[in-house]
Amino acid sequence: MSNKGGRVTVLTLAFVIACSLTEIGSAATVNTHALTTPKSKSQKVSETPHARRRMHRLARTRATTSTTRVHRRHRFYERFSTSSFAETTAEGDITTGEDPIVRQAAIDALGNMNGTVVAIEPTSGRVLAMVNQKLALSSGAQPCSTIKLSVALAALSEGIVDKETPVQLGRYNHMNLTSALAHSNNAYFEALGRKLGFDRISYYSHLFGLGELAGYDIPGESAGIYPDEEISTKLGGVGKMCSFGEGVSMTPLQLGALVAAISNGGTLYYLQHPTSPEDVANFQPRVKRHLEIASLLPDMADGMSGAVEYGTARSVRENFAFEPVLGKTGTCSRSGTRYGWFASYANTSVGRIVTVVFLQGGRPTYGPKAAELAGRMYRNLYDHNFFNQPATAATATAPASTLQ
């Protein structure tokens, strides 16, 4: 019994082992088949119309992006064809009737820059010095932001703003006249220009002397250009005319006469340029017209003073910090030439002097550079005790003639 039972047990065990081996073999066969890598078949890649269109759109997008970047670089790196420097600027000037101290101070300040300096006695309209007279008397140039002086006076005259009136600029920003003059904000003066309209702007611009001769019997002087109609909206319309003088051509003499009127309380003189000692001895001021701006000048003064103390003309203080100076800068470019303007007056205890610095050229030419040169000129005058000298008898006591 025991042998028979053992044989059965052995047979049973053998059967179980055989079944297990069969299952393992089957599993191994399945797994091997599953892991077998199928033979790769070469696939032919063809470009569908949809893919071609997608690639064309992508190429156009990249080309547009690249072109935009190039244009941005070209706008930022504007090319200029006019030199900022000149070997001689005073050659051919008629100087026999000018103040020698003022003239030398202007020559030293201008240096080799391509420009002109005009100095005016605001209480008489006498031109004390005019360096590079050919340029000063030429057809003029775009006034850039110095046009803001006449626009501000027009807006004050019409009661549209005073120095504290906030003007909305965009959705969240606003600015008053003092800050707009000090920082030369274009958007502010565009808004004023649109509010005033071309007809009123044109009226006041001509009233303040634009578009007409500023001098009396000065040979070779140009009257500049003030358009009879508003420039096209494509060029910015009256807004651009009022923010940086688009479409306008102003001469240094015209700007000097206007700043002299601001300085003296509202008398717009004919500018006179004596050419001999006899002309100086017999000098008689000539009034062009009286401007009703005396009550407006305190509102102008804060902005013009702010330009020098903390605004666009603060470079004046690099060279001259001894006397109050009020002024306005201007920077713009046209046809490969960049312009830099600074019109100002030094307000001293013994009198005032108006200076206009006008530069033309390339990248080194801009309004703050003109302001720097004006500061240098004021310092030269200060070093030669000019601001300690009272007005000359010929100009201090001479009655103002109203001859036209």
Language-model regions: role of each:
Residues L11-S20:
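Bacterial N-terminal signal peptides
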Residues Q133-L137:
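A short acidic/small-residue loop/turn micro-motif
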Residues C144-L153:
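Active/ligand-binding-proximal structured segments within catalytic/core domains
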Residues D93, N114-A129, S139, E158-L359, ...:
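Beta-lactam-recognizing serine transpeptidase/beta-lactamase-like catalytic domain environment
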Residues S2-L11:
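Bacterial N-terminal signal peptides that target proteins for export
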Residues S263, V308, G375-F386:
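Short amphipathic alpha-helical signal-transduction/dimerization elements
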Residues L255, Y366-Y378:
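Short, charged, low-complexity patches
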Residues C19, E23-V118, F358, D383, ...:
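Extracytoplasmic/periplasmic proteins that interact with beta-lactams or build/remodel peptidoglycan
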